[in-house]
Amino acid sequence: MGILLALLPAIAWGNILLVSVKMGGGAYSQTVGMTIGALFFATIMYVFTQPALTMTILIVGFISGLFWALGQVNQLKTVEKLGVSTTVTISTGMQLVATSIFGVIAFREWTTTTTIILGTIAILLIVVGVVFTSLDDKENAQPPGQLKKGLLTLIVSTFGYLVYVIIIRWYNIDGWSAILPQAVGMFVGAVVLTSKHKPFNKYAIRNALSGLLWGTGNLFLLLSLPRVGVATSFPLSQTGIVISTFGAIVFLGEKKTKRQLIFIALGSVLIIGGAVLLGMTKA
């Protein structure tokens, strides 16, 4: 039962970008719509769980949500440039590397020879995986400069996601307590970042569904942690990239050559393998 719970976040999160693209709209309306759904879900969860909310939790959770919005809107902007299958694998790899390196520097996570070796191998696997998934073929190449623009946008996205995760951990805030203030920050951040682009339209409403998926994944992650631990739940939650990557090719019709498909598959395996090793360093 615990393993099943730990897999559910991957299923939910792995479908977010697929659903978002299917619902239509641009990155701005998609981001706002996602936060509407997430805020609705978080409000319901707060009513049922009613965790204690101190001023620190409210402020830090809100700031965390603001940076999530920065990460999400830039990830969706990258999807418009590179497509879901390429964006999600590179984005996942960048996030894993960034959070791991920051964890070592700020929280001194890798303190033994074993964890240092495992962590180093994990990062190397993830980096190679990212390179594999971003390879182009001449017959299916990105327009000149498109990949570079996408990668630069993803760096901004990764920074947003990094602060979103790290600040909660820095202040040692429980996930249940953070849900509502984070969701409020996500919504406010999305509105501020997209206000010039008139994001409130029918596509924003449709994309509330992707926000509900995000909330569902978050819920199952919190439920699985006490049952299977971080070392198991963390890598399992990252396997959603398989759903996103190949779902985009199958259901969204993203065109890839045979060579690209092989390298995307290899890259996904390497990134997941790296995530598993990172999970072992957290054991």
Swiss-Prot record:
<feature type="transmembrane region" description="Helical">
    <location>
        <begin position="151"/>
        <end position="173"/>
    </location>
</feature>
<keyword id="KW-0762">Sugar transport</keyword>
<keyword id="KW-0813">Transport</keyword>
<keyword id="KW-0472">Membrane</keyword>
<dbReference type="Pfam" id="PF06800">
    <property type="entry name" value="Sugar_transport"/>
</dbReference>
<keyword id="KW-1133">Transmembrane helix</keyword>
<keyword id="KW-0812">Transmembrane</keyword>
<feature type="transmembrane region" description="Helical">
    <location>
        <begin position="26"/>
        <end position="48"/>
    </location>
</feature>
<feature type="transmembrane region" description="Helical">
    <location>
        <begin position="208"/>
        <end position="230"/>
    </location>
</feature>
<keyword id="KW-1003">Cell membrane</keyword>
<feature type="transmembrane region" description="Helical">
    <location>
        <begin position="4"/>
        <end position="21"/>
    </location>
</feature>
<feature type="transmembrane region" description="Helical">
    <location>
        <begin position="110"/>
        <end position="132"/>
    </location>
</feature>
<dbReference type="GO" id="GO:0015144">
    <property type="term" value="F:carbohydrate transmembrane transporter activity"/>
</dbReference>
<feature type="transmembrane region" description="Helical">
    <location>
        <begin position="178"/>
        <end position="195"/>
    </location>
</feature>
<feature type="transmembrane region" description="Helical">
    <location>
        <begin position="52"/>
        <end position="71"/>
    </location>
</feature>
<feature type="transmembrane region" description="Helical">
    <location>
        <begin position="260"/>
        <end position="279"/>
    </location>
</feature>
<dbReference type="GO" id="GO:0005886">
    <property type="term" value="C:plasma membrane"/>
</dbReference>
<comment type="similarity">
    <text>Belongs to the GRP transporter (TC 2.A.7.5) family.</text>
</comment>
<feature type="transmembrane region" description="Helical">
    <location>
        <begin position="234"/>
        <end position="253"/>
    </location>
</feature>
<dbReference type="InterPro" id="IPR010651">
    <property type="entry name" value="Sugar_transport"/>
</dbReference>
<protein>
    <recommendedName>
        <fullName>Putative sugar uptake protein BA_0200/GBAA_0200/BAS0200</fullName>
    </recommendedName>
</protein>
<feature type="transmembrane region" description="Helical">
    <location>
        <begin position="84"/>
        <end position="106"/>
    </location>
</feature>
